[in-house]
Each structure stands twice: as structure tokens, then as C-alpha cells.
């Protein structure tokens, strides 16, 4: 990922290609082809030409690919300072917003914290609703000084922080992205987590990325509208397991017609999970140039170039593990007046569970309870056996109760669950299983 090393390697391959071509031309000259018979001369020229252009062409193509990677690294990532893991985890705020006129980076439609174990890559996705209100900011932060009692402005929500910050950019001295900085401070106040990095995804450009990898396979549980009823292209994605192109994947992730914000958040998580699981290194290598072009136009981030290798390694580790999710949405959280202490406790518990710490405690408690219950059941069974009369010989056995088939899970807006009971993909220990 070193741009200097990539440039040196690129120039080296180009020089090697020129040198290789010169070597074959010189070998052809030393062979004195004009002294050979016509057929032999044509054969020698053909073999030399094939070897010259094939080898030199391969080297030049390699130089081109390296040049694409270098340009991608320069345009996508900065040269900022690396930030170490907080309590063994990297917390990255992922934001999605429209690229329409006057909207890029202003009002993110979706906000998700990817909390990643620095050793194992085990990932917890913490989603925040855009309509969250009445939340605090970290002590000493810019927004904390402006709103010491929390963000309680009438009609202002979490996704409005960026707009407020851009209107008061003078408060964020030296910041290139005041809207992002304000949003990060809000997310840190809500979750109690300190962010390492952030990434802003242009949702319109997301279509090109999906097309670059050949589409994504998703389980469509209900008809999902593409566009709005008044759009000329309005149609539906029909139910079933389908490979969707960029346009359909984008609408699968963001459609709200006949749905709600929280069902949409659940579908967005399913898209994230599918992309992580289905985009293999082989697919990425095969479509590298397309992916690089789409990604550099789609994502703005403060992840430094020196950290890219680390996050690629963590992503490869995450592919083989279950992704856990936590969404700070109803019915678990009152978005209009959240209990922040309770939210912090739920975030801490979800991280502990993802790391296995909660499971270890639960296993110990379960083992103790099972042992105590087994002792009690043994004594009770012995007493019942002594008191119960033996069954008469030849008596018919008592028929077992019929098994009642379980009802299929409710599906609302294309997601398992409902607004009143919550959506499975929003609170899950295995995101892939509920999608």
C-alpha cells in the first residue's frame, strides 16, 4: 500500500518490458535472419515477435494494474496519523448519504458503527436511527460545549448534526469535514464508544460498486419497490433468492415505500453481510480496475494509507465469522428520549457477547444451575418412583401429545419481524442466518 513503493515497482516493470523487448530484437539481429531460408526466417521472426510482445505486454499490463492501485490509494486514502485500537477494538463510523445537489455529506441517511476486534476481526454492527433526539455529546467536545444539556433542539435529529455544523463551521477550526466531526461527536455520546475512523458512502455511487463485482445475491422476502410510484421506472423486485444488480441492490437497501425506517435498516445490514461474504479475493482481483474506479468515486474516508493492510486482513478474518448486530431502535430504545445509560449498557453487553466474555460467564452460571437442578430432579424422581404404582401388564401406552407446527415468522417491509416486536436483522448474533 506504499505509494512510493508502488511507483518504483511500476517504473521497474515498464523498464523491464522495454529491456525485454530490446533483448529479443537484439537476439534476432545476432541470429542474422537474412542469411536463413525464407521459411526459417519467417519462423524465427514469428517466434521472436510472439515472445517479445507476450512477455513485454504482460509486464506492461502489470505496470498498468499497479498504476491503477497507486491512483486508487492516492485518491481514496489520506496520509493521516494512524489511531490505535480502543480497548482492543477498532470503531469505524460508516455513513451513507445521497450525492444529489447540495446533499453530499450533509444529511447521512444511515449511520452504523463497525466495532471490530483488533485480533480476530470479529465484528459487531451498531446501527443508529437518523431520527434519534435528546442525546449528549462527549465532555470537552465542540458540540458538547454548544449543547451542554444534550442535543435537544426542537425538530433536530441525529442526521441533522452535519447540517448544523456546516452552518457553524467557524466552531470547528482547522477541520476539513465539520459535518462529519459533529456527527462523530453525537455517535460517541450515544454509544459511549470512541471512534477511530469514519467512511462516507455515496449511495448513488454504490450502484457502480455492486455492478463492478457482478451483482450481489440476496434473499428477497417480500416485493420491494424500485423507485417511487410516480417514477417512470417504478417496478418491484419479486420475492426469492435473486442476484441483484447495482440499481436493484440500492433500492433493496433504501426503499421505504410500504415499509418503515427500521425495516430498511435491517435490509441494509443484510446487504452489508452479503457483500462481505460474497466478494472473495478472487472476485476482487478479477474486477480490480472496475472496483477501484467505483470505490474511489463512492467513498470518502479518513483511514490512512498505512492502515489499509491491517483492515484488509481484519476483513478477511471477518468473512469466516458470524457478524453480530445491535440497533438502537424501538421497541428497545425510545429514539425521541433515549435512556443513554441504558444504551451504553446495551452496547457494552453486545461487545462483551461478541468477544465471548458474556458467554463464558453464562456458561459457568448455566453449569452451576444445571448441577443444582440435576440433584433436585434426582431426589424428586426417586420419590415419585417409590410412590407411583407400576403400570399394569398389557396396558396401552399413553399417546404422545401432537406436535403443533410453528407459524412462519412475520415479515414486514421485506425484513423478518415487525415495528412493534423489532426486526431480527437489527438484533442478532448471526446476521447471515436471519437474512
Residue ranges of predicted features:
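Membrane-embedded alpha-helical segments of integral membrane proteins
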Residues: 2-32
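Non-catalytic, solvent-exposed segments at the cell envelope interface
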Residues: 60-435
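Perimembrane helix-loop junctions in membrane proteins
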Residues: 23, 27-37, 61-72
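Alpha-helical transmembrane segments
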Residues: 15-25, 53-60, 309, 322
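Structural motif marking the loop-to-transmembrane transition
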Residues: 4-11, 39-43, 288
Amino acid at each position: 500500500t506504499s505509494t512510493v513503493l508502488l511507483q518504483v515497482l511500476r517504473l521497474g516493470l515498464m523498464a523491464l518490458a522495454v529491456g525485454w523487448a530490446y533483448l529479443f530484437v537484439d537476439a534476432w539481429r545476432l541470429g542474422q535472419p537474412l542469411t536463413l531460408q525464407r521459411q526459417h526466417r519467417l519462423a524465427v521472426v514469428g517466434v521472436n515477435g510472439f515472445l517479445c510482445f507476450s512477455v513485454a505486454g504482460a509486464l506492461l499490463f502489470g505496470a498498468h494494474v499497479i498504476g491503477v492501485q497507486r491512483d486508487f490509494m492516492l485518491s481514496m486514502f489520506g496520509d493521516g496519523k494512524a489511531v490505535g485500537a480502543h480497548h482492543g477494538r477498532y470503531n469505524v463510523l460508516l455513513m451513507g448519504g445521497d450525492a444529489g445537489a447540495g446533499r453530499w455529506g450533509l444529511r447521512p441517511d444511515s449511520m452504523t458503527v463497525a466495532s471490530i476486534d483488533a485480533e480476530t476481526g470479529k465484528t459487531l454492527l451498531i446501527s443508529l436511527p437518523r431520527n434519534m433526539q435528546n442525546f449528549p455529546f462527549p465532555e470537552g467536545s465542540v458540540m458538547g460545549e454548544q449543547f451542554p444539556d444534550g442535543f435537544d433542539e426542537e425538530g433536530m435529529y441525529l442526521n441533522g448534526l452535519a447540517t448544523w455544523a456546516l452552518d457553524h463551521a467557524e466552531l470547528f477550526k482547522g477541520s476539513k469535514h465539520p459535518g462529519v466531526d459533529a456527527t462523530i461527536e453525537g455517535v460517541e455520546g450515544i454509544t459511549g464508544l470512541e471512534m477511530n475512523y469514519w467512511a462516507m458512502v455515496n449511495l448513488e455511487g454504490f450502484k457502480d460498486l455492486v455492478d463492478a463485482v457482478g451483482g450481489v445475491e440476496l434473499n428477497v422476502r417480500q416485493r420491494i419497490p424500485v423507485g417511487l410510484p410516480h417514477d417512470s421506472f417504478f417496478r418491484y423486485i419479486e420475492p426469492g433468492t435473486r442476484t441483484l444488480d447495482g440499481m436493484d441492490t440500492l433500492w433493496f437497501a433504501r426503499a421505504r415505500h410500504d415499509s418503515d425506517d427500521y425495516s430498511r435498516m435491517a435490509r441494509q445490514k443484510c446487504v452489508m453481510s452479503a457483500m462481505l461474504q460474497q466478494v472473495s479475493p478472487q472476485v476482487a482481483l478479477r474486477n480490480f480496475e472496475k472496483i477501484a474506479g467505483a470505490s474511489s468515486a463512492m467513498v470518502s474516508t479518513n483511514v490512512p494509507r498505512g492502515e489499509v493492510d491491517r483492515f484488509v486482513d481484519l476483513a478477511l478474518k471477518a468473512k469466516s465469522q458470524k457478524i453480530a448486530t445491535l440497533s438502537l431502535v424501538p421497541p428497545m430504545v425510545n429514539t425521541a428520549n433515549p435512556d443513554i445509560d441504558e444504551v451504553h449498557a446495551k452496547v457494552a453487553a453486545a461487545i462483551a457477547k461478541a468477544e465471548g466474555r458474556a458467554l463464558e460467564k453464562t456458561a459457568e452460571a448455566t453449569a452451576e444451575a444445571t448441577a443444582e437442578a440435576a440433584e433436585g430432579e434426582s431426589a424428586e424422581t426417586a420419590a415419585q418412583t417409590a410412590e407411583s404404582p407400576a403400570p399394569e401388564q398389557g396396558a396401552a401406552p399413553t399417546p404422545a401429545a401432537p406436535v403443533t407446527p410453528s407459524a412462519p415468522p412475520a415479515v414486514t417491509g421485506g425484513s423478518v419481524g415487525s415495528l412493534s416486536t423489532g426486526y431480527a436483522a437489527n438484533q442478532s448474533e448471526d446476521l447471515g442466518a436471519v437474512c
